[in-house]
Amino acid sequence: MAKPLSISSQPSVNVAWRDYFEMTKPKVVALMLLTVLVGMCLAMPTILPVQPLIAGLLGIAMMAGSAAALNHLIDRRIDGLMARTYNRPLPKGRISATRALIFAAALGSLGFVILYVFTNPLTAWLTFASLIGYALIYTAYLKRATPQNIVIGGLAGAMPPLLGWTAVTNQFHGHALLLVIIIFLWTPPHFWALAIHRRAEYAKVDIPMLPVTHGVEFTKTCILLYTILLAIACLLPVLVGMSGPLYFVCSSALSCGFIYKAWQLKYQDHEGLAMQVFRFSIYHLMLLFMALLLDHYLWA
């Protein structure tokens, strides 16, 4: 009897593991860790110290995963009503709310200890503040309270480059804040494009996203304006001497592409274009930070 029991229980173990992993939003965390790594590299003119590098990436990743799991927990009711999220572990009942809370608390606590002990207290507390900003202030309150939810709450999501910088230097620097500004301005057009595509679902669950409260055309205008502001912000690393020609060329090309996509969305919209803008924004941020990294090592 033992052997059949072992075989039949194996799929549930695999499913549980995958469900917990899904709650950490691994794709989002991976992009975030890229910006953390770039922040680390730009902070150091030489080779990165091994301990802050490994402990910093691991601790920040764990606390980011904890914040994502708390997001799943808090949003479980509305997730069950939206086509994009109804199959998540909590709405489907594959993981209970209690277990999700324990998982998030354990993951976040361990990440905090790793950062505090093996990196530095400054990075640990800044990462904790980001977790609170995203999981509680944004998810639990702002998301349901104001159409400017993503603008205000976006500050928490813009912190990773600063976290990477402080992880290896244990201090603030103006250059790190420039990277925060870039992600802060990138966040609204990124999420508003998705909100346009999913506006009916957001309206159904009473989430006051900008397309729901102010209309699609107003949101398209805001996306276009933010992409222009973002393009200006992307030039700041060059203007302050932080980055060189390679980054300037790459960032200019990416900014032109993003503005063009936003202009198309405003004046030549067609079915599926909002999601194209959303996807382009992801590649924009990823390639922009890769350009920062390459430029740093090629032109330093």
From Swiss-Prot:
PROSITE patterns assigned: UBIA
MF-aspect GO terms: protoheme IX farnesyltransferase activity
Organism for this UniProt entry: Shewanella oneidensis (strain ATCC 700550 / JCM 31522 / CIP 106686 / LMG 19005 / NCIMB 14063 / MR-1)
Disulfide bonds: none
Transmembrane regions: 28-48, 50-70, 100-120, 122-142, 149-169, 176-196, 222-242, 243-263, 280-300
Record-level GO cellular component terms: plasma membrane
EC number: 2.5.1.141
The name this protein goes by in its record: Protoheme IX farnesyltransferase
InterPro entries reported for this sequence: Protohaem_IX_farnesylTrfase (IPR006369), UbiA_prenyltransferase (IPR000537), UbiA_prenylTrfase_CS (IPR030470), UbiA_sf (IPR044878)
Bilayer topology term: Multi-pass membrane protein
Homology family: Belongs to the UbiA prenyltransferase family. Protoheme IX farnesyltransferase subfamily.
Function field: Converts heme B (protoheme IX) to heme O by substitution of the vinyl group on carbon 2 of heme B porphyrin ring with a hydroxyethyl farnesyl side group.
Alphabetized NCBIfam families for the sequence: cyoE_ctaB, PRK04375.1-2
Location(s), subcellular: Cell inner membrane
Alphabetized PANTHER family for the sequence: 4-HYDROXYBENZOATE SOLANESYLTRANSFERASE, PROTOHEME IX FARNESYLTRANSFERASE, MITOCHONDRIAL
GO terms of biological process kind: heme biosynthetic process; heme O biosynthetic process
Top-level lineage group: Bacteria
Note: Carbon 2 of the heme B porphyrin ring is defined according to the Fischer nomenclature.
Catalytic activity: heme b + (2E,6E)-farnesyl diphosphate + H2O = Fe(II)-heme o + diphosphate
Pathway: Porphyrin-containing compound metabolism; heme O biosynthesis; heme O from protoheme: step 1/1
